[in-house]
Curated annotation (Swiss-Prot):
Biased composition (Basic residues): 130-139
Basic and acidic residues bias (residue ranges): 32-68
Stretches that traverse the bilayer: none
Acidic residues bias locations: 1-15
Classification lineage: Eukaryota, Fungi, Dikarya, Ascomycota, Saccharomycotina
Keywords per UniProt: Activator, Chromatin regulator, Nucleus, Transcription, Transcription regulation
GO BP, one annotated term: chromatin organization
Record's protein name: SWR1-complex protein 5
Lyase in keyword set: no
InterPro entries named in the record: BCNT-C, Swc5/CFDP1/2
Length: 194
């Protein structure tokens, strides 16, 4: 068997990955240093977050005291800016590149990032005290009246309205009152009175 036959057999395996001569196994010290770096990064983030909260609380107390004293409206309120300490982190990532050629190599990239200080500003008390009115609908009052849901009538009321409209339309109201002597209501009245 030649090297090409061995490679073609290996490439058919689902879990096959090329390994170059330059690859080195990671030692425990590299793994520990990565864990240590992650822990340090997490602690730095937590410290910066606590500092921001502390600064925000102090600024809010100052604003509250100014509002409480009543002199806040006459004086100009300046936004508070927070300066974050510059933190430089170095991250090393190793990427393996898989290809169909047997000479795949591992690349190592080192990047350095610097976070720029982002000033945080507290909105002025005058802007926060302003009460916003609810927005008025944009339709005209006539359209609002037309779009209101109509009151639904129950079946009995609808039947009475339909019968009344029919009687008025046909003009048979007088005839019904004269010739309705054999109706149910008349019989009930007769029985109740006698």
């Amino acid at each position: 068997m030649t090297n090409e036959d061995l490679l073609s057999d290996s490439e058919n395996d689902e879990d096959f990955a090329y390994k170059s001569d330059k690859e080195e196994d990671f030692s425990d010290s590299d793994d520990e240093s990565r864990k240590l770096q992650r822990r340090i990064d997490a602690e730095n983030k937590q410290a910066m977050a606590k500092e921001e909260v502390k600064v925000d609380k102090d600024a809010m107390r100052k604003i509250y005291e100014e509002m409480k004293s009543g002199s806040g409206a006459a004086n100009e309120i300046k936004p508070v800016t927070v300066k974050k300490p510059d933190v430089t982190t170095t991250q090393t990532t190793q990427q393996e590149t898989a290809s169909t050629t047997p000479t795949a190599s591992t690349t190592s990239t080192t990047t350095s990032t610097t976070s720029a200080p982002a000033p945080a500003s507290i909105p002025s008390s005058a802007a926060t005290n302003k009460v916003k009115k609810p927005k008025r609908p944009k339709k005209g009052s006539l359209l609002d009246a037309m779009n209101k849901p109509k009151k639904k009538l129950n079946t009995l009321e609808q039947s009475k309205a339909d019968w009344g409209a029919f009687v008025d339309k046909e003009g048979i109201g007088h005839d019904l009152s004269q010739h309705n002597k054999d109706g149910y209501l008349e019989k009930r009245d007769f029985l109740d009175t006698h």
